[in-house]
Amino acid sequence: MTAAGDAVVHAPQCRFCAPHDSRTLNRVKPRRRARNKRALAAIGLAVALAVAVALAGLPLFVFPSIDEPREVDAIVVLGPPRDARIHAAQQLAAEGYSDTIVIAVDDYGIDAAINIDACPPDAAPDEAGLVTRCLIPEPFTTAGEAIMVERLAAAEGWESVMIVTNVTHISRARMIFTDCLGGGVLAVDDGAGIEDSNWAWMYAYQSAAFVKALVAPTC
């Protein structure tokens, strides 16, 4: 209330401001809520898919079916040819499961035959009659290894092989080798395990590689 004669002071009006319209604000709020709901739904769907993929991969990459060793024509060490994997193959040979070991090696770097103690200068049997052959698949991938072993099996008359690799690789390697060789494939774990810091990366890599192998078979 103002006294008689007092001047009424009005706040200056903004010449450049949009007029205040409650109806406009009422329309904006529902739109914003709708966008938020859609964003939350998309996030929820992405999380659900990630969980589903992770759960689906457990029996393939964390708890795969590992074959019981039995006598085969050759034991195949899949790359990279690390010491633990080679030693696992040598132990299987020492237990009488095969007299032939094939080690997949690269043509350069730390995985080249020249840098691997288990690779002999020739393929002559050792004192125990064990033949170790270090061969370069083209390309140096699981698919390349399967193609290489398929050709070896045809040339040597092999009917069975036992592949040695890490636990996350077993399911995919068995599938690819079985596709190429048509059967007679065993897959065993090298026993080396996976470091905790590498599990997420290995899981993602093997998942993508498994899907690729399903979509584009090797043989």
Where do the PLM segments sit?
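Secreted/extracellular small peptides and ectodomain modules produced from precursors
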Residues: 12-15, 117, 132, 217
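N-terminal type II signal-anchor transmembrane helix
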Residues: 29-66
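Short alpha-helical segments used as structural interaction elements across diverse proteins
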Residues: 32-35, 82, 209
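A structural signal for short, hydrophobic/glycine-enriched beta-strand patches
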Residues: 61-203
